[in-house]
A protein has these predicted regions:
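Acetyl-CoA-dependent GNAT
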Residues: 7-84, 89
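Conserved acetyl-CoA-binding loop-helix of GNAT-fold acetyltransferases
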Residues: 88, 94-107, 133
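Conserved beta-strand-loop-alpha-helix junction that forms the acyl-donor binding cleft
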Residues: 118-132, 137, 144-145
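Acyl-donor-binding surface of acyltransferase catalytic domains
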Residues: 1-12, 137, 142-145
């Protein structure tokens, strides 16, 4: 099962978005046993800043067996848990780590008694092939579980 380790948004931005090509590998500094194995493609600092102006967002590393698999950002929005960002290392996709992360959030929803998990997928293909098979339903422009 994956776990989440909180981190600071600025640390992620410094590591990913300020690099010229965004191909930087690094280790989880608070736990030196975590390997250098995460990368993030296709996002600019501007895009992420614009996406998260609506309040406090908790950034987390997605970790399994001391390996950073990806990053996620979530927001406690009263009765709902909003997944603002979920990205698995492109070299590790298709192995179920994203689905494990969603299962983690489903368990969190049940334990915290959130009414729903909300998210806004990058595109319709991601919604159809990833989130909907995991139980998410369309609700206007968002997906809800």
């Amino acid at each position: 099962m994956v776990t989440l380790k909180p981190t600071k948004r600025d640390f992620i931005f410094d590591r990913f978005f300020e690099k010229k090509n965004n191909y930087e590998y690094f280790y989880y500094e608070e736990d030196p046993t975590v390997e250098n194995d995460i990368e993030l493609f296709g996002y600019s600092k501007f895009t992420c800043d614009a996406s998260y102006e609506d309040g406090e967002v908790q950034w987390n590393y997605i970790i399994k067996d001391h390996r950073i698999l990806g990053i996620t950002a979530v927001k406690n929005d009263g009765d709902n848990l909003k997944i603002k960002f979920l990205e698995i290392n492109s070299k590790l996709r298709g192995r179920g780590f994203g689905a494990e992360t969603i299962e983690y959030f489903k368990a969190l929803k049940d334990n915290k008694k959130y009414k729903a998990i909300l998210l806004y997928p990058k595109d319709e293909e991601v919604a159809e092939h990833f989130y909907k098979p995991l139980g998410f339903k369309e609700n206007g422009g968002e997906l809800i579980y």
